[in-house]
Structures are given as structure tokens and as C-alpha cells.
């Protein structure tokens, strides 16, 4: 072997090794599937669960989540600033902020502005609201109008600061966005508000998880929640239950969606293992 051949072989070997160890850029194209990898996030309360279950600090739990392939965190309102900083230091971008403004009771301007400021100060452009509740499962047309009007007011304020306002199909029969019919009505009444598609929350009679696909044009974020067979309220790792997660994610990507997918399994007693399994399943799609 001459010197030139040896140099060429060395360069090839170095490039091959670099390709193996170089981390994938967030928006890099997966040349096997021809698509960018999914942007996966986790709820901040799930990180807290991991810390408690594993007996480690929040920062250590966030690092474990990042190692599992998660790159974002959906922050619940009230999370301490030092924990948000720890998550960001671990490499988790703030994907969304979730707030509970209780619009059925009134419009707290300071609280609403603080929610938006929390997002802006952490480089986040989405706030999801659980806007309010009816007194019971019965619909209340007058209260619906009040909650919608205050949600639109919030959305107008947030938009001036570059933040989108979102609502999800919420799994509480007292919610004005429970089920596909109520969610559609709410979004029609609030055209400036985006939709968070929670794959595990379409549980009303006659509904299927795919019901939300008709709202795909309004989707700005996804909560990927799976359900165990025979338990419409249970929690399990994404991909291990009966919800057609792969089909829904594929439909979203085919429609051009390239935003965040927050994995969700509230109540899991083995949260880190669920996170790892969910991330592995989703990365393989």
C-alpha cells in the first residue's frame, strides 16, 4: 500500500467514525424515511416524577430524559424558575407553557400576562390554556360564550408578543373542549386559537382517537397519549396501547406538520422506563 492510499483510507475511516458519533441536528432529514425526525417533548411534571421515583435531582432527571432522545419540555404553570433553567441546561427547549386561567370565574390580567411572559422569557412561542369549566357535565351556552370571549382576549394579547394560544380536547366532561363536537365548536368560535391534538382524549361514545384528524388544519401541537386495552383512562408507554399513534403521526406529517410532539403518561409508576419506550417507538416511525 502506498502513502497516498493509506491517507485516503485514513480519511474515509475518520469520516465514517464521525458519522457514527455525530448527533443528529434537530431539523436534519432522516434519509431512510425522507423526513425530519420528530421533535419530542415531555411534561415538566413527568420529569418531577422521574426525580421522585429514581431518587435524583430534577436536573439529573432532566439529563436522563435528554439522553432518552427527548429534546423539549412542556412547562406546567407554577414550575419553579430554577427547574426550568435546569431543564434548559440539560438541553431541553421549552416547547409549550400550560396554564389554567379559570376564565369561568373572570379574567385575571396579571396572571394572563405572566403566562405569556413565562413563555417569552424562555424562548417559547406557545401557551396552551385549559380555559375553564362548566359547573357540571351539562353544557352551558352562556358560560361557553364567556370562556370563549376571554380566550380570544388572551389570544389577542399573546399574539402581540409572538405567542400562539392553544386549547386541547380535554378529558373532563365539564370542559367546553371535551370531545370532538365541543372542541370543534370552541375552535370555530375562536378562530385565532390553535389546536393541541391529544390522541388519548377522544373517549366519548362514538368517538375514536382519529376523530381529531378533521381538526388537523388547526393543529399546532400534539400530546401523544396511549391507552391500555380496556382502560380508556389508563396510562401506558406510547406505542404499547390501543391508540393508533403511528397512523395519527403519519397523517400529521403527511399534512406538513413539523412541530412538537409531547409524550404523555400521567400516573405512570415507572416514568423513566415509559419515556424511554415512548421515545424509542416514536423515533422508529
Language model regions located:
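C-terminal helical cap(s) of enzyme catalytic domains, especially alpha/beta-barrels
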Residues: 271-285
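Active-site beta-loop-alpha junctions enriched in small/polar residues
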Residues: 43-47, 76-78, 99-103, 132-134, ...
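Alpha-helix-loop-beta-strand connector modules within alpha/beta enzyme cores
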Residues: 86-101, 148-158, 186-190, 245-248
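Conserved, mostly hydrophobic/aromatic
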Residues: 65, 87, 119, 165, ...
Amino acid at each position: 500500500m502506498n502513502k497516498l492510499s493509506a491517507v485516503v483510507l485514513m480519511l474515509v475511516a475518520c469520516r465514517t467514525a464521525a458519522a457514527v458519533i455525530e448527533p443528529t441536528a434537530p431539523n436534519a432529514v432522516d434519509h431512510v424515511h425522507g423526513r425530519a425526525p420528530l421533535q419530542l417533548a415531555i411534561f415538566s411534571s413527568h420529569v418531577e416524577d422521574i426525580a421522585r421515583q429514581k431518587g435524583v435531582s430534577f436536573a439529573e432527571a432532566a439529563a436522563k430524559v435528554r439522553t432518552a432522545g427527548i429534546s423539549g419540555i412542556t412547562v406546567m404553570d407554577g414550575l419553579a424558575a430554577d427547574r426550568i433553567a435546569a431543564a434548559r441546561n440539560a438541553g431541553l427547549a421549552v416547547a409549550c407553557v400550560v396554564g389554567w386561567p379559570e376564565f369561568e370565574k373572570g379574567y385575571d390580567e396579571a396572571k394572563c400576562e405572566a403566562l405569556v411572559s413565562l413563555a417569552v422569557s424562555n424562548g417559547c412561542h406557545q401557551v396552551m390554556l385549559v380555559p375553564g369549566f362548566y359547573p357540571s357535565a351539562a353544557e352551558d351556552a352562556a358560560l361557553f360564550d364567556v370562556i370563549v370571549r376571554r380566550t380570544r382576549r388572551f389570544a389577542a394579547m399573546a399574539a402581540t408578543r409572538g405567542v400562539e394560544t392553544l386549547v386541547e380536547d380535554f378529558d373532563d366532561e365539564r370542559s367546553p373542549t371535551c370531545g370532538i363536537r365541543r372542541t370543534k365548536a370552541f375552535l370555530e368560535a375562536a378562530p385565532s386559537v390553535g389546536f393541541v391534538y391529544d390522541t388519548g382524549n377522544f373517549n366519548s361514545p362514538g368517538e375514536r382517537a382519529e376523530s381529531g384528524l378533521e381538526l388537523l388544519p388547526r393543529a399546532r401541537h400534539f400530546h401523544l397519549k396511549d391507552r391500555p386495552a380496556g382502560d380508556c383512562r389508563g396510562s401506558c408507554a406510547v406505542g404499547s396501547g390501543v391508540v393508533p399513534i403511528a397512523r395519527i403521526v403519519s397523517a400529521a406529517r403527511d399534512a406538513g406538520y413539523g412541530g412538537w410532539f409531547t409524550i404523555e403518561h400521567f400516573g405512570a409508576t415507572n416514568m423513566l422506563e415509559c419515556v424511554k419506550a415512548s421515545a424509542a417507538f416514536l423515533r422508529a416511525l
